[in-house]
A protein has these predicted regions:
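Ser/Thr/Gly-rich flexible loops in soluble cytosolic domains mediating phosphotransfer, phosphorylation
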Residues: 85-126, 130
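Hydrophobic/aromatic ligand-binding patch that stacks against planar heteroaromatic rings
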Residues: 22, 82-85
Length: 131
């Protein structure tokens, strides 16, 4: 498989750590919507890198977006704002999380559990950009 550029987003801080590690170990490049050095406000919101650094990973070639959700909630969390941007950019969405109460269910192209996140991202990219 070709090296993928994967935009990893988290419903809650830390949700995507294991998924990002798996992707990097498989040779893929991981991108984030947020800079770890930018603190969140009390509600959990923090500005994305487009606001703090003047560029967005989606301005470059992102092959697939991965949303890691560890909890069931019908409302998007502050860290999931990038899902909207990825949908608008036409990037395939893979979700590591349960479909129950998922506010993004209609836009998810592939759903997976943590153990198969690499394969799901590769399959989503191949389906979107393959021959």
């Amino acid at each position: 498989m070709t090296t993928l550029d994967v935009l990893v987003m988290e419903a809650s801080p830390g949700d995507g750590v294991a998924d990002a590690r798996r992707l990097e170990e498989a040779g893929h490049r991981v991108h984030r919507c947020y800079d770890d050095d930018t603190p969140a406000d009390p509600s959990g919101w923090r500005p994305c890198v487009a606001l703090t650094q003047g560029w967005c990973p989606l301005d470059e070639q992102i092959d697939v977006a991965l949303l890691s959700r560890s909890r069931l909630t019908p409302r998007p969390g502050a860290g999931e704002v990038g899902v909207r941007c990825a949908v608008r950019a036409g990037v395939p969405i893979v979700e590591d999380g349960d479909a129950l109460l998922d506010p993004f269910a209609e836009w998810v192209d592939h759903r997976t559990d943590g153990a198969s996140v690499v394969a799901a991202c590769e399959e989503a990219a191949m389906a979107a950009f393959g021959p």
